[in-house]
Amino acid sequence: MNHIQEAFLNTLKVERNFSEHTLKSYQDDLIQFNQFLEQEHLQLKTFEYRDARNYLSYLYSNHLKRTSVSRKISTLRTFYEYWMTLDENIINPFVQLVHPKKEKYLPQFFYEEEMEALFKTVEEDTSKNLRDRVILELLYATGIRVSELVNIKKQDIDFYANGVTVLGKGSKERFVPFGAYCRQSIENYLEHFKPIQSCNHDFLILNMKGEAITERGVRYVLNDIVKRTAGVSEIHPHKLRHTFATHLLNQGADLRTVQSLLGHVNLSTTGKYTHVSNQQLRKVYLNAHPRAKKENET
């Protein structure tokens, strides 16, 4: 990458508090763009709208999802906007490029009985289950991101207020409450999980060697739980986040509260969770519609 691109990434890190994960995505987008420039014998400074359209076609030819293409174009549009503030001769070739529409999807979630089955799998008090259960409890009870989970320190847990302070996107702190089951799980883990009693750091969630667990490690733990649970398949940390939001909304929580708990900046981001299960839809319909049931039906 050239010095302008490096300065751009540094600005995102210092002034806009972008996470390392987000910065890595921006960096990868710029590297791929540079490879295209080299392949087509194009220059960054003379890149124009026609070239931008060709680049869009190039991305689609690599069989990328529309969401990925949309993000890559957004990265380059933002980069050129930054460059324009430094050089008045620069023109943003991506400003008129129409964003590819993102695929619409309903977030996947677990039904309540599926969650109960997952918890039943880790209910026996073995050393591994103590750790696995606290991971499952925290993700489901709080809806936090896996990146937030792995960075929780022991001092972030507030047993007086029954909640945890996490560092979210943009380095923003938020407090998320948890319930009695999650509290008990954390207490049992801290008291009986041997690696945490002998480690020399403050991270809460550890691997079996006593080291701070990684995001990949969390995914491995969740996949292992699913393998041991009958009737449940396909799990990932964000699915538990979807489940957290869906179950709250299904039980009557308002959208603003869920937005705050999830740490979303925009309410529209939380809006995707307003879907409900078919079972819940039918329940609401049967109870609400005047002609949903005959008089002799219950």
Swiss-Prot record:
Major subcellular location class: cytoplasm
Recorded GO CC terms: cytoplasm
All copies of domain Core-binding (CB), residue ranges: 1-84
Localization: Cytoplasm
Molecular functions per Gene Ontology: DNA binding; tyrosine-based site-specific recombinase activity
A Pfam family: Phage_integrase
Gene3D superfamilies to which the protein is assigned, alphabetical: 1.10.150.130, Intergrase catalytic core
InterPro entries, per the entry: CB, DNA_brk_join_enz, Integrase-like_cat_sf, Integrase_catalytic, Integrase_recombinase_N, Integrase_SAM-like_N, Recomb_XerC, Tyrosine_recombinase_XerC/XerD
Keywords: Cell cycle, Cell division, Chromosome partition, Cytoplasm, DNA integration, DNA recombination, DNA-binding
Domain Tyr recombinase positions: 105-286
Assembly and binders: Forms a cyclic heterotetrameric complex composed of two molecules of XerC and two molecules of XerD.
HAMAP family: Recomb_XerC_XerD
Family: Belongs to the 'phage' integrase family. XerC subfamily.
Protein name as it appears in the record: Tyrosine recombinase XerC
Organism name: Staphylococcus aureus (strain Mu3 / ATCC 700698)
The organism's taxonomic lineage, starting at the top: Bacteria, Bacillati, Bacillota, Bacilli, Bacillales
Gene name tied to this protein: xerC
